[in-house]
């Protein structure tokens, strides 16, 4: 690795994780030597369903309506990404394009050119390496070509947030790429949205917990995790062993997934989940509001993002009056029964145990780790309309930042 590559990588690491003061902090636990990344460590107890034998109506009835996680097979059979999304080809085609791999203390995106990131990925011994998690690739002239390499699966094309407008809607799609030991800490996706995560290369380890699981049971404390508190590998080192003990409550035992190349995980809204990369992985993930989960998403959006909800409703009234009619019937005083990873939705089932004071973070099914880390370092300001100024994953900052 040449001097320039080392310099760019060092700059990105310093900006994204300022709490790690020197290089030894990144390898303090020596997880690259000690942590078990083998497939045998995963129980893999979530149902799989072949999309070639599953109609959209069956998917809704069997999985989406009952909020049941599932691993879908053969979603990616026709995707060009299966051939195009390799380290070698991505490094060659996008070598000088910058991808987001973190956020600094002020919520600005930390970005790295693909050529430097691949060098980092192939050589790192970091306990929890930097992880490309880029939500703006679809808005960039060159990076948007990634959109041509995959199709939104048939079951997830009911994208109701499109009616909020592209500029105002929360970030919803991410290109995701990282080495072994990278990942995202335990979280619930924002605003009651559900998500799908399609893995093209590598293997991911998932743990999922039902929405009513007490957060204090599954969150790593500062005393336990130190400055690696929010990292996925810390969670698997600290919390996971407890879930396997006889004293762990049966109703809160995790679902586990060993996600393989070509498999797509469906994460229903409200489910806690944590994801660890077992080797180099490349994936795409999207969050969505559908006709099925709309009542809960609407409830949480009105409570957590009032300005967004007003604009969304105006357009729904014009374009989808059937959905606006559903919104009219939602009782905003009733609990949704679906937890939030923040206290903004005061009527949610998790509000009594929540310790966060910010509104719901706009991150994807794998993406809350960076957002939570930033929350602890700064407090977003409130605008007069009740929305948090750090809304939309600091989308306007991210798009204008060249860091």
From Swiss-Prot:
Extent of Basic residues compositional bias: 1-11
Motif Nuclear localization signal 2, residue range(s) on this chain: 91-95
Keywords: Chromatin regulator, Cytoplasm, Developmental protein, Differentiation, Dioxygenase, Iron, Metal-binding, mRNA processing, mRNA splicing, Nucleus, Oxidoreductase, RNA-binding, Transcription, Transcription regulation
Residue positions of motif Nuclear localization signal 3: 141-145
GO biological process, one term: sprouting angiogenesis
Domains as described in the record: The nuclear localization signal motifs are necessary and sufficient to target it into the nucleus.
Official protein name in the record: Bifunctional arginine demethylase and lysyl-hydroxylase JMJD6
The species this protein was found in: Danio rerio (Zebrafish)
Record gene name: jmjd6
């Amino acid at each position: 690795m040449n001097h320039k590559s080392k310099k760019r990588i060092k700059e990105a690491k310093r900006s994204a994780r300022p709490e790690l003061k020197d290089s030894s902090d990144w390898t303090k636990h020596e997880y690259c030597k000690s942590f078990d990344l083998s497939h045998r460590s995963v129980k893999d107890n979530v149902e799989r369903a072949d999309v070639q034998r599953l109609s959209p109506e069956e998917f809704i009835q069997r999985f989406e309506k009952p909020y049941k996680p599932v691993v879908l097979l053969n979603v990616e059979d026709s995707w060009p990404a299966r051939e195009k999304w390799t380290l070698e080809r991505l490094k060659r085609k996008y070598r000088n394009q910058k991808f987001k791999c973190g956020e600094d203390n002020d919520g600005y995106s930390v970005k790295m050119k693909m050529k430097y990131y691949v060098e980092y990925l192939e050589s790192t011994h970091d306990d929890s390496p930097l992880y490309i998690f880029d939500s703006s690739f679809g808005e960039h002239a060159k990076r948007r070509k990634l959109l041509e390499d995959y199709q939104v699966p048939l079951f997830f094309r009911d994208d109701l947030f499109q009616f909020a407008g592209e500029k105002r809607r929360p970030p919803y799609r991410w290109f995701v790429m990282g080495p072994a030991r990278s990942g995202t800490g335990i979280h619930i996706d924002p605003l009651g949205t559900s998500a799908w995560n399609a893995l093209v290369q590598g293997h991911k380890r998932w743990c999922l917990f039902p929405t009513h699981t007490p957060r204090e049971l599954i969150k790593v404390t500062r005393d336990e995790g130190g400055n690696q508190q929010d990292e996925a590998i810390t969670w698997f080192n600290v919390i996971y062993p407890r879930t396997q003990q006889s004293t762990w409550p049966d109703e809160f035992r995790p679902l586990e997934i060993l996600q393989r190349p070509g498999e797509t995980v469906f994460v229903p809204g409200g489910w806690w989940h944590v994801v660890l990369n077992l080797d180099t992985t490349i994936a795409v993930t999207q969050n969505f509001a559908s006709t099925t989960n709309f009542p809960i998403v609407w409830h949480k959006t009105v409570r957590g993002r009032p300005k967004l909800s007003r604009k969304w409703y105006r357009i729904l009234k014009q374009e989808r009056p059937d959905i606006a009619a559903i919104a009219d019937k939602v009782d905003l005083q009733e609990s949704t029964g679906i937890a939030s990873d923040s206290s903004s939705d005061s009527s949610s089932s998790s509000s009594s145990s929540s310790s966060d004071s910010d509104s719901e973070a706009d991150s994807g099914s794998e993406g809350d780790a960076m957002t939570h880390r930033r929350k602890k370092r700064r407090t977003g300001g409130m605008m007069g309309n009740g929305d948090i100024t750090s809304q939309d994953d600091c989308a306007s900052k991210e798009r204008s930042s060249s860091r």
